[in-house]
Curated annotation (Swiss-Prot):
Name of the protein: Uncharacterized lipoprotein TC_0107
GO cellular component: plasma membrane
Family: Belongs to the chlamydial CPn_0875/CT_734/TC_0107 family.
Signal peptide per UniProt: 1-21
Top-level taxonomic group: Bacteria
Membrane topology category: Lipid-anchor
Protein keywords: Cell membrane, Lipoprotein, Membrane, Palmitate, Signal
Main location: membrane
PROSITE patterns for the chain: PROKAR_LIPOPROTEIN (PS51257)
Lipid-modified residues, N-palmitoyl cysteine kind: 22
Record lipid sites (S-diacylglycerol cysteine): 22
Subcellular localization: Cell membrane
């Protein structure tokens, strides 16, 4: 009887061990994967889309490094002023007369319409030596009359003086007002050399214009 029990008990154990080797365990173990399946899963993992956070940061980095550097503003080009010994040409005198008469006579609308012509004329007389320009004004009664009319039009005069002062200060920074040139200019117009020198050294351009307008040579 004992032999019979041992025999069947041993057979049952063999049967259970055989079943456990071919069936999943109660803990959910899965059959072993072959090499091809492992490679396929690793490829899928690598191709998995980035999470929202990673996607956002990588996008920000791309934008940061692709951002263009701000363009540097070009430095203003200073005029290459002519020498005081260089006389004005007839064309330059014509351009000066046009600018003064337009600013003195034209209405606001007419000035706006003639803006291109005025700018063109100004660009052509831009490099005339400041003292030569003032001397040309003082020697022409029509230009003196035009300058006085401009003084009566505040907004025109303010714009004119702002641009003129800027150009004259640029000339001063380049050393265009030599002692000899200032003395020759004052002598030509019958002005006191010391007074003119003081005005030029102080860059009081509005005062210099006023002296020229009020003390014409003819």
């Amino acid at each position: 009887m004992k032999k019979f029990v041992y025999k069947y008990s041993f057979g049952a154990l063999l049967l259970l061990s055989g079943l456990s080797s071919c069936c999943p365990s109660s803990y959910g173990s899965t059959p072993a994967k072959n090499t091809a399946e492992i490679k396929e899963e690793s490829v899928i993992l690598r191709e998995e889309p980035e999470s929202g956070c990673k996607k956002k940061s990588s996008c920000c980095l791309r934008k940061f490094f692709s951002r263009k550097k701000p363009k540097e503003k070009p430095e203003p080009v200073l005029p290459n002023f002519k020498s005081y010994a260089d006389p004005m040409t007839d064309a330059e005198r014509k351009d000066l007369s046009f600018v003064v008469s337009a600013a003195a006579e034209k209405s606001s609308i007419a000035l706006a319409m003639a803006q291109g012509e005025i700018k063109g004329a100004l660009s052509r007389i831009r490099e005339i030596h400041p003292l030569v320009l003032l001397q040309a004004l003082a020697e022409d009664p029509a230009l003196i009359a035009g300058m006085k009319k401009m003084q009566g039009r505040d907004w025109v005069w303010n714009i004119f003086m702002t641009e003129l002062s800027k150009a004259f200060s640029q000339a001063a920074s380049l050393g265009a007002f030599s002692v000899a040139d200032v003395a020759a200019f004052a002598s030509t117009l019958g002005l006191d050399s010391g007074t003119v020198t003081s005005i030029v050294d102080g860059e009081r351009w509005a005062e210099l214009i006023d002296v020229v307008i009020q003390s014409p040579t003819i």
